[in-house]
Design a protein with these regions (language model features):
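A boundary/linker detector
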Residues: 1-30, 34-36, 43-47, 118-126
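A generic structural signal for ordered alpha-helices
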Residues: 9, 16-20, 54, 68-75
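Short cysteine-rich loop/turn motifs with clustered Cys
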Residues: 25-71, 94
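Generic domain-boundary/flexible-linker signal
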Residues: 50-53, 87, 105-108
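Short microdomains enriched in Cys/His and/or Lys/Arg
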Residues: 59-81, 114-126
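Short beta-strand-alpha-helix junction that forms the catalytic/metal-binding core
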Residues: 70-73, 78-99
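Short Cys/His-centered divalent metal-binding micro-motifs
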Residues: 90-116
Length: 126
């Protein structure tokens, strides 16, 4: 069993990112299928799908990097500011960048948001 570093998920199954096509109808994973698996802010790349159980016992498919750092779906215009859940308003973003952005706007987000630059370079290079 693998434990994700940020989310409290117990990952029980891993699939290659190429299997994402099988999930193109899945509400959240559709964002990664249509817009890619790279954080729009720091460039961190999702390379695998992990199926895990959260602390409430619910199972989810999520996108992870090689070292199981999660990518999330971000609202370009935050819901708190009237943004929708439509695909046009959603983008892939790593967990750290998404937390840093909060309910702010993309243009206000510092592109060097404390993400490990060496790790980012490693994922971009591979």
């Amino acid at each position: 069993m693998i434990r994700a570093k940020v989310f409290k998920y117990e990952i029980v199954k891993v699939k290659p990112i190429s299997d994402l096509i099988k999930f193109k109808g899945h509400r959240r994973l559709k964002v990664f299928y249509n817009k890619g698996c790279t954080c729009v802010t720091c460039g961190l790349v999702g390379t695998k799908l992990g199926y895990g159980k959260d602390k409430k016992g619910h199972f989810h498919w999520d996108v992870y990097t090689d070292d199981f750092y999660p990518l999330t779906v971000d609202h370009i215009i935050p819901k708190s500011k009237g943004g929708s859940d439509e695909l046009e308003n959603l983008q892939p973003m790593c967990y750290k960048c998404n937390v840093t952005k909060g309910n702010g706007d993309n243009h206000k987000l510092n592109l060097n948001v404390n993400c490990n630059k060496d790790r980012v370079k490693t994922f971009i290079a591979t």
